[in-house]
């Protein structure tokens, strides 16, 4: 969940500090509590760090005044040790000549720390990361050169990591990766390495993805990588040119990334559908696997789980043996050799999902992945890879990536049923029409719901996953407690909480309208205030109803309405929906 950036330049320059600052700001969406920067020149290694926001730390520590030919930057999300100045990265060794930044969890850090302490090493933080510079120092004391010392240090670590290290006297950045994202940007007389592409997108579009178990170093003009067995890697076919631009990763006049990304949903749908249609051979191979599999297990976390639940319900309606699985509960499930796993993740780096996939692969299952990031860890673990084309999503709360997950899964389902998939060409215009026509109403509902302390979100059939996602969104960004459940379960307990003014949000996709109407009437009889989002058929018993007429893709259209409601509830409370407290965009620790 930490953000990482490293820059190595051919000349010593304060302008590199400005690039690091810019990169750190682009990494803020990952969630963090402290910030730090290291610079290296011919004379010294300097570290400045503190608890706080990027702006606060940059100003307080005068980071823009730092100079050097190598820089490291880090935004920390606390896992080992509280968020403090001394726990912020980078961490250094006893001599102050080695600096390290790290994302991940070192499982054997306590044993290594104790061993290093017996050798005389002094630690100044509570973090697991700090053992790494001390390990490098210890191996160099024993006569190893810098790279050998780094390699041996990495080999002693158990757990997950994306590590960058600099050593005084070395004009290169050392790196290692296991389970956490790390990508290289190739510039002119300057190279970059970061946890996310947007960190260096202003300076280069040429990237090189580092695979699990690899380590190496970058200089101003060279990249060296060796695999987990120590063999040099041929990089000739690794370099890719990405088609994102800087504007795509900026707010473009919107007050927040979240609302910008909701409005980008139509374009994301269009790009994703174009990609799916151009790759029908892959889709048909996946469908053949689905038909021949004994079970189809759809795995995801958070928003991705809700998309997976929607897909699993569709497959169950076709008589297929399918069920959804929350990624973090993977240890309760044993895969079989004829199982097909659908793994869904926006980032492709969610650790509990990766652990689930690796376990199921070992048990003989085949993996289909759906992700927004090309060559992500999840994609590399998969037999079949489907890429959404949502573009970068900066806001922590998933919006357009949920929509592109749904459109991708609906496309596969339609292809499975041999429906005409040309209808998907119109999905973008339908969602665009819904956003423009209902945003004002969604704003009013959001403002009302922002004043509530608890809300029920109700759905039946295919509306249930949408209700669950709507409840999650308003919890995430507006800090309002919301519970989603099948509307038919109301009399089995939940209705006991309903009294005068209690808000319910009923999701009606037009399939099971009559039964849902009865549930709304029951709630209103106990004093509830009913808000209804309907597609194609009205409930007409609500206090407030947003009605979407002539809708071909109710899941998409209803979802953007629920996202708008959550966004305006957040803004109404004066909150920043892009950075919900205690949350991060990508969960890469257990």
Swiss-Prot record:
It is found in: Cytoplasm. Residues 2-221 form the Glutamine amidotransferase type-2 domain. Its EC number is 2.6.1.16. The active site is at residues 2, 585. GO terms for cellular component: cytoplasm. CDD domains: GFAT, SIS_GlmS_GlmD_1, SIS_GlmS_GlmD_2. GO terms for biological process: carbohydrate metabolic process; fructose 6-phosphate metabolic process; protein N-linked glycosylation; UDP-N-acetylglucosamine metabolic process. Residues 286-422, 445-580 form the SIS domain. One of its GO terms (molecular function) is carbohydrate derivative binding. Keywords: Aminotransferase, Cytoplasm, Glutamine amidotransferase, Repeat, Transferase. Pfam families: GATase_6, SIS. It is an enzyme of class 2 (transferase). It comes from the Archaea. Its main location: cytoplasm. Disulfide bonds: none annotated. It catalyses: D-fructose 6-phosphate + L-glutamine = D-glucosamine 6-phosphate + L-glutamate. PROSITE patterns: GATASE_TYPE_2, SIS. Catalyzes the first step in hexosamine metabolism, converting fructose-6P into glucosamine-6P using glutamine as a nitrogen source. Homodimer. This is Glutamine--fructose-6-phosphate aminotransferase [isomerizing].
């Amino acid at each position: 969940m930490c953000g990482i950036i490293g820059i190595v330049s051919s000349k010593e320059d304060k302008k590199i500090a400005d690039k690091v600052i810019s990169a750190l700001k682009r990494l803020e969406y990952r969630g963090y509590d402290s910030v730090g920067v290291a610079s290296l020149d011919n004379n010294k290694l300097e570290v400045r760090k503190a608890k706080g926001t990027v702006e606060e730390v940059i100003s307080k520590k005068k980071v823009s005044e730092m100079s050097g030919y190598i820089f490291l930057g880090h935004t920390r999300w606390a896992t080992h040790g509280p968020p403090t100045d001394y726990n912020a990265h980078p961490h250094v060794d006893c001599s102050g000549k080695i600096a390290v930044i790290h994302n991940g969890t070192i499982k054997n850090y306590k044993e290594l720390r104790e061993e290093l302490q017996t050798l005389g090493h002094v630690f100044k933080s509570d973090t697991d990361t700090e053992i790494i510079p001390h390990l490098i120092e210890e191996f160099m004391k024993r006569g190893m050169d810098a790279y050998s010392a780094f390699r041996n240090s990495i080999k002693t670590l158990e757990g997950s990591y994306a590590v960058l290290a600099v050593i005084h006297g070395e004009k290169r950045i050392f790196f290692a990766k296991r389970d956490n994202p790390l990508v290289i940007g190739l510039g002119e007389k300057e190279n970059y390495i970061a946890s996310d592409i947007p960190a260096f997108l202003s300076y280069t579009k040429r990237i090189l993805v580092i695979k699990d178990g690899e380590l190496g170093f970058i200089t101003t003009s060279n990249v060296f990588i060796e695999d987990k067995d120590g063999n040099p890697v041929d990089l000739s076919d690794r370099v890719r040119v990405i088609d994102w631009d800087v504007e795509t990763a900026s707010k473009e006049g919107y007050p927040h990334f979240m609302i910008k990304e909701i409005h980008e949903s139509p374009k994301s749908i269009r790009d994703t559908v174009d990609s799916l249609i151009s790759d029908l051979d892959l889709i048909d191979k996946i469908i053949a696997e689905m038909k021949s599999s004994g079970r189809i297990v759809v795995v995801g976390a958070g928003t991705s789980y809700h998309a997976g639940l929607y897909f699993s319900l569709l497959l169950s309606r076709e008589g297929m043996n399918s069920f959804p699985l929350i990624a973090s509960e993977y240890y309760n499930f044993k895969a079989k050799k004829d199982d097909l796993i659908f793994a869904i993740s926006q980032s492709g780096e969610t650790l509990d999902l990766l652990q689930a996939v690796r376990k199921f692969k070992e048990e003989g299952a085949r993996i289909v992945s759906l992700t927004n990031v090309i060559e992500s860890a999840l994609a590399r673990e998969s037999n079949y890879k489907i890429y959404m084309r949502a573009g970068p999503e900066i806001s922590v709360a998933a919006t357009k990536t949920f929509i592109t997950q749904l459109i991708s899964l609906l496309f596969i389902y339609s292809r499975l049923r041999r429906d005409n998939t040309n209808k998907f060409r119109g999905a973008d215009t339908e969602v665009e029409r819904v956003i423009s026509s209902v945003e004002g109403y969604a704003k009013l509902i959001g403002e009302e719901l922002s004043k509530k302390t608890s809300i029920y979100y109700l759905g039946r059939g295919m509306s249930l996953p949408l209700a669950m996602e709507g409840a999650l969104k308003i919890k995430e960004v507006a800090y309002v407690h919301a519970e989603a459940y099948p509307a038919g379960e109301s009399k089995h307990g939940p209705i006991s909480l309903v009294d005068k003014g209690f808000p319910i949000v009923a999701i009606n996709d037009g399939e099971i309208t009559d039964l849902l109407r009865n549930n709304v009437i029951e709630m209103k009889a106990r004093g509830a205030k009913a808000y209804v989002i309907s597609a194609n058929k009205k409930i007409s018993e609500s206090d407030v109803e947003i009605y979407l007429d002539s809708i071909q893709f109710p899941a998409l259209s209803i979802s953007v309405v629920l996202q708008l409601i959550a966004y305006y509830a957040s803004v109404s409370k004066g909150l920043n929906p892009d950075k919900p407290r205690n949350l991060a965009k990508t969960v890469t620790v257990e």
